[in-house]
Amino acid sequence: MKVTQEKLPASQISLEIEISPEMSKNAYEQIIKKYIRSANIPGFRKGKVPRNILIQRLGKNYIKAMALDDLINNCLEKAREQESIKAIGQFELKTEFEELVKDFEPGKEMAFSAKVDVEPEAKVEDYKGFLVQAEEAKYDSALVDEFLEERRSRMGTLIPIEGRAAEMGDVAIVDFVGIIPSETEGEEAQEVPGGKAQDFQMDLKEGQFIPGFIEGIVGMKLQETKEISAQFPSEYSEANLAGKPVVFTVTLKELKEKELPELDDDLAQEISEFETIDKLREFLEQKFTKEKEEKTKQNKEKAIIDELVTHLEVEIPETLIKNEVQQMLAQSAMDLSQYGIDVKEFFSSEKLPEMQERTRPEAIERLKRDLVIATVAKRESITVDEEEIKAESQKVVKQLKEKDFDSDRLRQVVTQELLKEKTIKWLEANGTVELVPEGTLHTESQTPQTTEILETEVESEIPQASETIVEVKAEEVATVENSQE
């Protein structure tokens, strides 16, 4: 067997494989023997079927196809080992299989060509002596005050409102459905996926939903139904909705205002396991300080990698891109399902191709960032030893508790993260990162989902007591008012 390699664009190689007459004959004879042993043909015992009867019954082309399939697969595997090819994904024939079957004659020479994606050869120049800027995230005591006020608001008593229109700061209970108007005449309007709810409770605060939605509810009266026109931001998290106009039909069913508790030890005990408000503040100060330090670390890491990516030379194979897109969409589906959203609506067979195409640029960018780290680590002989991987994996397993996980995937992720951490540390020592005030540099904004209220991450890590929003009925309010007269 003779193998000739040829480099192709996009990190592919082509193999021209020449097969000897002996190999082609042996492949054909092996298939004949296999079917003689296993074929069930009336009038003959297994293993006793005459050769000519078998060929007549199965058809010579069928037997040739089976023989050629085995022959090609075996030859490709031998070629991969013989030529030390670091293949990614599956080999793809450059000639139609049917054509190869047609030309295949057992006992005669033959040749075929196949191509395959291989590990990309990445080059990074000028990765030492760089100068980049990164935002320094500093702790501000206002973060604690804002968080406590938000929790205080949640623990407020809801008092029904009658006799006035909705105002900012109220709590509204509404039914709504969002419709994307048709762009062409005769086309039906499209209902917004996940943009429909009944008896949905919301705080009338700016920034909770897409611009225009909350503002449209302000001024509505009880039991009023109104159409509110809005537009999804151009950088909306769901790309298929970004920039599109939307009309919400909203019915205001109930309106309430909050009577807030005092910010004292009693409140601290209600919203956490801390006995005093001072202890809770101390915990929050430490937590937010740590978060800001971690954010600064992430900003520095991003700035370094962004700079190095500009010096990266690489052709990324299609197989890697498709795999990355698949992983990203799978993660998105998992995240959406945690909010109770039916992912089948988002990832239908009609929408999936478009979502894959929209995800592709980000997937390529992520791959470039990974390749930059891997390339520098290889150039500078930065490695992770087995003990480090084992220790970090055990930490992650403890955090996962009893959740199911893929141990091989876990090891891969842990190894990549440790290698990245070591490489970033090395790069910091061999370059300069200038810290600038937070908000100085451009950062990507995050737009909330239609029915999604994003909570502060620190909230889930505070030792919790009970969480209760006391709701007072209208008749109870009347009783209280009468007793005060």
Swiss-Prot record:
HAMAP family xref list: Trigger_factor_Tig
Source organism of this protein record: Trichodesmium erythraeum (strain IMS101)
Keyword annotations of the record: Cell cycle, Cell division, Chaperone, Cytoplasm, Isomerase, Rotamase
Enzyme class, first EC level, given as a word: isomerase
Major localization class: cytoplasm
Location of the protein in the cell: Cytoplasm
UniProt free text on domains: Consists of 3 domains; the N-terminus binds the ribosome, the middle domain has PPIase activity, while the C-terminus has intrinsic chaperone activity on its own.
Pfam families named among the record's database cross-references: FKBP_C (PF00254), Trigger_C (PF05698), Trigger_N (PF05697)
Domain named PPIase FKBP-type: residues: 169-261
Stated family: Belongs to the FKBP-type PPIase family. Tig subfamily.
Described function: Involved in protein export. Acts as a chaperone by maintaining the newly synthesized protein in an open conformation. Functions as a peptidyl-prolyl cis-trans isomerase.
Domain of life: Bacteria
GO CC terms of this entry: cytoplasm
GO biological process: 'de novo' cotranslational protein folding; cell division; chaperone-mediated protein folding; protein transport; protein unfolding
Name recorded for this polypeptide: Trigger factor
InterPro entries: PPIase_dom_sf, PPIase_FKBP_dom, Trig_fac, Trigger_fac_C, Trigger_fac_C_sf, Trigger_fac_ribosome-bd_bac, Trigger_fac_ribosome-bd_sf, Trigger_fact/SurA_dom_sf
